[in-house]
């Protein structure tokens, strides 16, 4: 049985593993910039200038990475 891929988790995990700088747009229009250090079902930890922020996912509109994120999985053919 093939397990379904969670795109959100894969995307955030690649941002974290590859230390890709990201701009996070919040629903209120505020922007946060930094590195994703961790995440779970409800929150994202963003590090900016050595300081961490816990951001609730329900407040996030968009993640805009500074470069493209590799979305191909290990088991996916080229």
Curated annotation (Swiss-Prot):
CDD domains: Hfq. It comes from the Bacteria. GO terms for molecular function: RNA binding. Pfam families: Hfq. InterPro entries: Hfq, LSM_dom_sf, Sm. Belongs to the Hfq family. This is RNA-binding protein Hfq. It comes from Halalkalibacterium halodurans (strain ATCC BAA-125 / DSM 18197 / FERM 7344 / JCM 9153 / C-125) (Bacillus halodurans). The lineage of its organism: Bacteria, Bacillati, Bacillota, Bacilli, Bacillales. The gene is hfq.
């Amino acid at each position: 049985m093939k397990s379904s891929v969670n795109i959100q988790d894969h995307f955030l995990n690649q941002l974290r593993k590859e230390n890709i700088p990201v701009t996070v747009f919040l629903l209120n229009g505020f922007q946060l910039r930094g590195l994703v250090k961790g995440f779970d079902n409800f929150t994202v930890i963003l590090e900016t200038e050595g300081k961490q922020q816990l951001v609730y996912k329900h407040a996030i509109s968009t993640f805009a990475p500074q470069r493209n994120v590799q979305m191909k999985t290990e088991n996916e053919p080229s």
